[in-house]
Amino acid sequence: MVDAITVLTAIGITVLMLLMVISGAALIVKELNPNDIFTMQSLKFNRAVTIFKYIGLFIYIPGTIILYATYVKSLLMKS
């Protein structure tokens, strides 16, 4: 049977991965030409992209380290 810590760890890893993907996509969109259709000249869209850009910048390295450490831990637990 799976314990609560394993379930919470899996949920945490999933949320962190989704946030990293969304933030990475925001970084890509932010670097596009300002006249592109993706920017849509919308203040709310640009504000959301900027927020995800900063989140992506601040969690990229720690998030990657956490995901790697969790992966190594799961490998060690299996053997």
Curated annotation (Swiss-Prot):
Its main location: virion. It is a multi-pass membrane protein. It comes from the Viruses. The keyword Signal does not apply. It holds the Pfam family Pox_I5. Residues 30-47 are virion surface. Induction: Expressed in the intermediate phase of the viral replicative cycle. It is found in: Virion membrane. InterPro entries: Poxvirus_I5. GO terms for cellular component: membrane; viral envelope; virion membrane. Keywords: Late protein, Membrane, Transmembrane, Transmembrane helix, Viral envelope protein, Virion. The chain crosses the membrane at residues 9-29, 48-68. Residues 2-8, 69-79 are intravirion. Envelope protein. Belongs to the orthopoxvirus OPG081 family. This is Protein OPG081. The lineage of its organism: Viruses, Varidnaviria, Bamfordvirae, Nucleocytoviricota, Pokkesviricetes. The gene is OPG081.
